[in-house]
Amino acid sequence: MSAADALLQDLLSGDATRIHASACRVAVTFDPGLLDALAPHADRIERACAGVTLGGALLANQVHLQSALKRLRYWQAQAGCLCALTPTYLFFDPRRLIEQGQMQLLSVGDADDGWGECHHVACTQCGQHWQVTDREYHYPWWEWKVA
């Protein structure tokens, strides 16, 4: 079974744990093969997940599913570079994206407000420059702004 098939089965399963784990993976993927395979199923996934309580404490886990669906629809519509979605999902760690080759590190410094580290990065696909600030409030998250 392919990775895309396994993710699709999880997302259609009705099992909150499987949906959550797979939605988190889809929400951050840049893999064209996964996106090509899953994007046509976005509406089906949304229908299958309707009414499934995904839980969450400070942040509803539904945010991961919504971000995954948004990513699939954006890809399907060929709306542009996937980096445009980074500000809409708090869990894009610029260090991971640099490791994956999706972003290039331009510089690192302190955040303008003194809270957190600021990474200046550029998308390796489209060249868009981003200012990404490490944030934390019960869990780490990242604030992405066009530079």
Language-model-detected regions and their locations in the chain:
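Short Cys/His-rich metal-coordination motifs, predominantly Zn2+-binding knuckles/fingers
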Residues: 84-86, 123-126
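Short inter-helical turns and helix N-cap capping residues of alpha-solenoid HEAT/ARM repeat scaffolds
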Residues: 14-16, 46-50, 58
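Short recognition patches in nucleic-acid-associated and regulatory proteins
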Residues: 79-118, 132-135, 141-142
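Amphipathic alpha-helical scaffolding segments comprising HEAT/armadillo-like alpha-solenoid repeats
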Residues: 1-10, 29-51
